[in-house]
């Protein structure tokens, strides 16, 4: 072993001596000497690994690009579908609005004709009353007819005014807001009322009214109670009165204790035997108009109320 090492040392020294004699080795020859054997193999492996990394990076970027492209295509498709749906909805709404305007115009013309007929009939009765002023039986016959005709003409004038306002509102994009109620709302004493034909919980009904810039109806007087009662029908109907914290409160802040009340006998009783959990914290109208407390989750009809000009001009 010692002999072999000495021979290797001898050869190495000989190469160095020859190198110094012959001058520095060329760069290419030096690289070949340095990269021969295992070094050359490692360099090849390194280059192969680098190439593999580059291929992986390019493949990953291409895959990400493909996913982004699919996402963009999906988003564009959804956007196109939504846009088409919105255009169709707007077109349908425009057609419905045109039909509503046409219907209201027809009603206005009908009311104008009916009003004119009523005025003519009233004038005729007035003339007859003047001619028969000396008839002893005329007051008992003519006066009731005259009064009835006068009330009829006054009602026709009011209805015509409302319809004319609604047509102007629809034609002028709600520029007459504040002068009349929206279509399908009922005007009474400077307020607008909307009566539902389906059922919701008390909270859902109140939210619905709020979306129309209104609230569940608040009863302030016997006169308002009688007005609302005429439109109730046979269904239980929510009003804007509840006591979730143990004290009855109106949704608009009206004082409950000193205000008008119309409870059924023995109500409110906060009955808890219904099996639905909790008590009865929301008030509703019976078909006869009297009030009762019940579970707020029951799907009852409801009435929205708002000041004149505060409601949404959207038709229901």
From Swiss-Prot:
Q: Topological domain, Extracellular: which ranges?
A: 61-316
Species per Swiss-Prot/TrEMBL record: Homo sapiens
Could you confirm whether the keyword Nuclease appears in this record? Answer: no
Q: Which residues are glycosylated?
A: 78, 173
* Gene Ontology terms: biological process: adaptive immune response; endocytosis; immune response; innate immune response
Would you tell me the Gene Ontology cellular component terms?
Answer: early endosome membrane; external side of plasma membrane; lysosomal membrane; plasma membrane
Q: What membrane topology is annotated for this entry?
A: Single-pass type II membrane protein
Pfam families in the record: Lectin_C, Lectin_N
Q: How does it assemble?
A: Interacts with A-, B- and C-domain containing PTPRC/CD45 isoforms: isoform 1/CD45ABC, isoform 3/CD45AB, isoform 5/CD45BC and isoform 7/CD45B. Does not interact with PTPRC/CD45 isoform 2/CD45RO, a memory T cell marker.
Coordinates of motif Endocytosis signal in the sequence? 5-8
Residues the record lists as binding Ca(2+) 2? 218, 220, 224, 305
Name the reported effect of residue 30 to A.
45% reduction of receptor-mediated endocytosis
Among the GO molecular function terms of this UniProt record, one is:
carbohydrate binding
Bilayer-spanning residue ranges: 40-60
Tell me the PROSITE patterns matching this sequence: C_TYPE_LECTIN_1, C_TYPE_LECTIN_2
Q: What keywords are annotated for this sequence in UniProt?
A: Adaptive immunity, Cell membrane, Coiled coil, Disulfide bond, Endocytosis, Endosome, Glycoprotein, Immunity, Innate immunity, Lectin, Lysosome, Membrane, Signal-anchor, Transmembrane, Transmembrane helix
Record function comment: C-type lectin receptor involved in recognition of N-acetylgalactosamine (GalNAc)-terminated glycans by myeloid antigen presenting cells (APCs). Binds in a Ca(2+)-dependent manner to alpha- and beta-linked GalNAc residues on glycoprotein and glycolipid antigens, including alphaGalNAc- and Galbeta1->3GalNAc-O-Ser/Thr also known as Tn and T antigens, LacdiNAc epitope GalNAcbeta1->4GlcNAc and its derivative GalNAcbeta1->4-(Fucalpha1->3)GlcNAc, O-linked core 5 and 6 glycans, and GM2 and GD2 gangliosides. Acts as a signaling receptor at the interface of APC-T cell interactions.
List the protein's name.
C-type lectin domain family 10 member A
Q: At the top level of its lineage, which domain of life is listed?
A: Eukaryota
Residues bound to Ca(2+) 1 are: 269, 280, 292-293
Domain named C-type lectin is located at 188-305
Topology Cytoplasmic: residue spans: 1-39
Q: Where in the cell is it found?
A: Cell membrane; Early endosome membrane; Lysosome membrane
């Amino acid at each position: 072993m010692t002999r072999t090492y000495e021979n290797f040392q001898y050869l190495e020294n000989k190469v160095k001596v020859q190198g110094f004699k012959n001058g520095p080795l060329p760069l290419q020859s030096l690289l070949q000497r340095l990269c021969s054997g295992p070094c050359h193999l490692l360099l090849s492996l390194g280059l192969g690994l680098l190439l593999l990394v580059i291929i992986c990076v390019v493949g990953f970027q291409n895959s990400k690009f493909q996913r982004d492209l699919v996402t963009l295509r999906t988003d564009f498709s959804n956007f196109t579908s939504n846009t088409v749906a919105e255009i169709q909805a707007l077109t349908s709404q425009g057609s419905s609005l045109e039909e509503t305007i046409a219907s209201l115009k027809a009603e206005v013309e009908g009311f104008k004709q009916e009003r004119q007929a009523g005025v003519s009939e009233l004038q005729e009765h007035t003339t007859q009353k003047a001619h028969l002023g000396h008839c002893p039986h005329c007051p008992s016959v003519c006066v009731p007819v005259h009064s009835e005709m006068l009330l009829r003409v006054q009602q026709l004038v009011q209805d015509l005014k409302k319809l004319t306002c609604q047509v102007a509102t629809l034609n002028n994009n709600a520029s007459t807001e504040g002068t009349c109620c929206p279509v399908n709302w009922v005007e009474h004493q400077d307020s607008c009322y909307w009566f539902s034909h389906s059922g919701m919980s008390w909270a859902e009904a109140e939210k619905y009214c709020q979306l129309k810039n209104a609230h569940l109806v608040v009863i302030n007087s016997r006169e308002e109670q009688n007005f609302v009662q005429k439109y109730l029908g046979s269904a239980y109907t929510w009003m804007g009165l509840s006591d979730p914290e143990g004290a009855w409160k109106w949704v608009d802040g009206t004082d409950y204790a000193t205000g008008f009340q119309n409870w059924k006998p023995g109500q409110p009783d906060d009955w808890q035997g219904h099996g639905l959990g909790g008590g009865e914290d929301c008030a509703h109208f019976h078909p006869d108009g009297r009030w009762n407390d019940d579970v707020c989750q029951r799907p009852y009809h409801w009435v929205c109320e708002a000041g004149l000009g505060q409601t949404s001009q959207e038709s229901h």
